[in-house]
């Protein structure tokens, strides 16, 4: 299957500048193509991942991906999709963000072989361009009326846009032109909001490299959920690729909770499963939705891809422990992941009566209630039911000498650490 046909089947193409021309190029030769990201933060979220998944699909089809981290454009900020001016970051913060993104993106691509990926930073070819060179060599190639008509600018005219953000599309166009000239890059990929920036780059290439220069642009549809809300957010906020911001367990849980109405679409967008495999999972969604086979596959594929096989096994282990209530097999690291959002208390390093301990921490409102819950078998320590009001909590009740997990009833968990 031609890579363009595959992307169309997956519903991953929104606009193309020259579908027939691009289809011919990718059929006849290996091409270089790029997608960029600005270091506006120290981590990508799963929304950022979408265009890079397309880039990876091209690599799997034998083409050479170029990953651009915008050390230069990041100093300005892309106005696309923004209702107000971005706050500028310090160069030091941008440099730190660049390195963080390099690490995350480095896990997604293969940097060896005939279709080896490369990673570039547009600061390297932009830093020495003087303001006079910028205006003379590039500014003169852009018609202000054309720039004003692009959605990325037009949408901001009423509230105002600075010259800095107005000029962003010129800098991005310079990137495409540079990669065309020095890396033989023929295609830029981006989200649907990048169409104006991409076409600006194509215009600059034709002016700088000649009217017969062959270059293409392709954008990806905005991904929304069946309920109309924005993809990539949970109740706790964005789902990050950085495991310190979103743990692998939380990452796994995000995908496992996908709505039946969305899961097949996500399998097409985010996994490398074949059409036959996805059709089989789609059938299971229709016939056996309660088994959630599609969601489990999606969660497993994504956790392995972004994190690792080991991280997936850890997420599955945590999920199983929480479902069964048997938490004794969990490590301290797994407990920190799985119980990140439960009420957490800090206890003294001392031997204390269970009833007194529950009340002193605030898990129980009174000794009377604590005794009643213990007597009735509603209190569990590390998964074991406690019905003895005389029990003493000591070091033997700690997992790896760091945590004690308390459960009240069937699902109410509390995490206790120690001073």
From Swiss-Prot:
ATP binds at residue 233. One of its GO terms (cellular component) is cytosol. A motif ('HIGH' region) lies at residues 39-48. The keyword Membrane does not apply. The keyword Cell wall biogenesis/degradation does not apply. Its EC number is 6.1.1.1. Residues 352-418 form the S4 RNA-binding domain. L-tyrosine binds at residues 34, 168, 172. Its main location: cytoplasm. This is Tyrosine--tRNA ligase. It comes from Listeria welshimeri serovar 6b (strain ATCC 35897 / DSM 20650 / CCUG 15529 / CIP 8149 / NCTC 11857 / SLCC 5334 / V8).
């Amino acid at each position: 299957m031609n890579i363009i046909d595959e992307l169309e089947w997956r519903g991953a193409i929104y606009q193309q500048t020259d579908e027939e021309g691009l289809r011919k190029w990718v059929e006849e030769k290996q091409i270089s193509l790029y997608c960029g990201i600005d270091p506006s933060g120290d981590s990508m979220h799963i929304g950022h991942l979408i265009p890079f998944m397309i880039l990876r699909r091209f690599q799997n089809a034998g083409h050479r991906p170029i990953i651009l981290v915008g050390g230069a454009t990041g100093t300005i900020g892309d106005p696309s999709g923004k209702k107000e001016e971005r706050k500028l970051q310090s160069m030091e913060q941008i440099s730190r963000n660049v390195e963080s993104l390099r690490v995350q993106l480095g896990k997604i691509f293969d940097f060896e072989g005939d279709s080896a990926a490369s990673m570039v930073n547009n600061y390297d070819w932009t830093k020495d361009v003087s303001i006079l060179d910028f205006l003379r060599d590039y500014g003169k190639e852009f018609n202000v009326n054309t720039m004003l008509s692009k959605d990325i600018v037009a949408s901001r005219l009423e509230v105002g846009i600075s010259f800095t953000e107005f000029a962003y599309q010129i800098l991005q166009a310079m990137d495409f032109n540079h990669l065309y000239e020095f890396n033989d890059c023929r295609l830029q990929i981006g989200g649907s909001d990048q169409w104006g920036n991409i076409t600006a780059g194509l215009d600059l290439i034709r002016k700088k490299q000649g009217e017969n220069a062959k270059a293409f642009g392709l954008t990806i549809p905005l991904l929304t959920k069946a309920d109309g809300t924005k993809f990539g957010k949970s109740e706790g906020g964005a789902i990050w690729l950085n495991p310190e911001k979103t743990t692998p367990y939380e990452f796994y849980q995000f995908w496992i909770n996908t709505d039946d109405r969305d899961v097949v679409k996500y399998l097409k967008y985010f996994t490398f499963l074949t059409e036959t495999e996805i059709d089989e999972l789609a059938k299971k969604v229709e016939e056996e939705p309660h088994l959630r086979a599609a969601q489990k596959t999606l969660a497993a594929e994504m956790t392995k891809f972004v994190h690792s096989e080991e991280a997936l096994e850890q997420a599955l282990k945590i999920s199983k422990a929480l479902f069964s209530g048997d938490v004794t097999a969990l490590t301290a690291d797994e407990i920190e992941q799985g119980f990140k959002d439960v009420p957490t208390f800090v206890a003294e390093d001392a031997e204390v009566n269970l009833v007194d301990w529950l009340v002193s921490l605030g898990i129980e409102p009174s000794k009377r209630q604590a005794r009643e819950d213990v007597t009735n078998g509603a209190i569990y320590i590390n998964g074991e039911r406690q019905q003895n009001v005389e029990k003493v909590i000591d070091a033997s009740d700690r997992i790896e000498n760091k945590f004690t997990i308390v459960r009240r009833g069937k699902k109410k968990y509390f995490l206790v650490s120690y001073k």
